[in-house]
Amino acid sequence: MAENNPLKIHNLRPAPGAKTAKTRVGRGEASKGKTAGRGTKGTKARYQVPERFEGGQMPLHMRLPKLKGFKNPFRTEYQVVNLDKLTALYPEGGEVTVEGLVAKGAVRKNSLVKVLGQGEISVALQVTVDAVSGSAKEKITAAGGTVTELV
């Protein structure tokens, strides 16, 4: 039975008619010769025009405005934590550090952290982070906490 099995690597062939040769145009009158599928006369019959060419109309890349301004390479980006998030993470109060926030999953490690003043706070927190906004500092100290900025 194994000798008659046609499913062997050397017997595999594509189905008849599945593979057809590419039509070579412009090779004689009988087979798409003469104009070779380009129609008669005109620019596109004589040579290839770039796809981006818009027929003399102002091209898209020249119609669009240029970018303005610049990107400051010395900009410092902070991960933001608001006061309402801190009250949810530390309901009994306590010491807030960058490492503690990373451990609780509030921020990613190896980047600066800034506390902003959105929300209210009623417990005393000892906050030690890279930066704190003015409103957050006022609210934390009013609640009996302390603020230490690392940067």
From Swiss-Prot:
It comes from the Bacteria. It comes from Streptomyces avermitilis (strain ATCC 31267 / DSM 46492 / JCM 5070 / NBRC 14893 / NCIMB 12804 / NRRL 8165 / MA-4680). Signal peptide: none annotated. HAMAP family: Ribosomal_uL15. The gene is rplO. Binds to the 23S rRNA. One of its GO terms (molecular function) is structural constituent of ribosome. NCBIfam families: rplO_bact. Residues 1-60 are annotated as: Disordered. This is Large ribosomal subunit protein uL15. One of its GO terms (biological process) is translation. Belongs to the universal ribosomal protein uL15 family. GO terms for cellular component: cytosolic large ribosomal subunit. Keywords: Ribonucleoprotein, Ribosomal protein, RNA-binding, rRNA-binding. Part of the 50S ribosomal subunit. Transmembrane segments: none annotated.
